């Protein structure tokens, strides 16, 4: 693992547990066990580090969500939360804390949101055999985002509820009683 990847991998859990705005550079250099000079040399400032962390997390997240059905999508989301923790959407938290004053962070969050929308559209099209209408896509996206948020206080029950609701929506859309 190169030093840049090492710093990013050590910074992510610090941001996840403590927030973006509240986390100082001293805490980040301690977590990565590097000097501030090394951190700045490889990643620039805090905003660049946050963007690199968001990009790495986005890649890992979408690798996990490389599935072909809506049911598998919610199963993958639950697996992600069990592995990574259920503290709500990392990207939404970054946007709320930093996006308003850091355009680079806002751009990372926007890229994530666009990719999530595209991924869900692809999975839905695979399930339906055709592109989903915008309403159904938005409904599945709301269930996905809602489960992500709700899992922070309801645990796995949030994923079961979202998965069940998504199955009902698909059944109603396709006219199948069991799917």
Which ranges hold each PLM region?
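Hydrophobic/aromatic-rich alpha-helical bundle segments in the mid-to-C-terminal region
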Residues: 104-110, 126-179
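Amphipathic alpha-helical segments used for helix-helix packing
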Residues: 83-107
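An amphipathic alpha-helix signature
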Residues: 8, 71, 114-121, 125, ...
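Hydrophobic alpha-helical connector segments
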Residues: 52, 62-87, 136-140
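Amphipathic alpha-helical interaction segments
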Residues: 6, 48, 72, 76, ...
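Helix-turn-helix
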Residues: 6, 10-48, 52
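Amphipathic, non-transmembrane alpha-helical scaffold segments
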Residues: 54, 58, 106-117
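Solvent-exposed, amphipathic alpha-helical segments
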Residues: 10-17, 64, 143-150
């Amino acid at each position: 693992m190169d030093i840049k990847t090492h710093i990013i991998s050590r910074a992510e859990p610090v941001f996840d547990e403590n927030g973006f705005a509240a986390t100082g550079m001293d805490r980040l250099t301690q977590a990565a066990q590097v000097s501030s000079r090394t951190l700045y040399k490889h990643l620039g400032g805090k905003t660049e580090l946050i963007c690199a962390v968001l990009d790495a997390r986005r890649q890992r997240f979408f690798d996990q969500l490389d599935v072909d059905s809506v049911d598998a999508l919610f199963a993958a989301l639950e697996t992600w939360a069990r592995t990574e923790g259920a503290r709500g959407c990392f990207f939404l938290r970054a946007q709320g804390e930093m996006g308003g004053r850091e355009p680079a962070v806002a751009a990372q969050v926007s890229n994530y949101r666009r990719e999530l929308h595209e991924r869900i559209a692809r999975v839905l099209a695979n399930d339906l055999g055709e592109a989903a209408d915008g309403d159904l896509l938005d409904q599945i996206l709301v269930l996905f985002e809602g489960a992500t948020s709700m899992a922070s206080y309801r645990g796995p029950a949030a994923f079961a509820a979202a998965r069940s609701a998504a199955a009902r929506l698909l059944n109603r859309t396709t006219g199948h009683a069991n799917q």
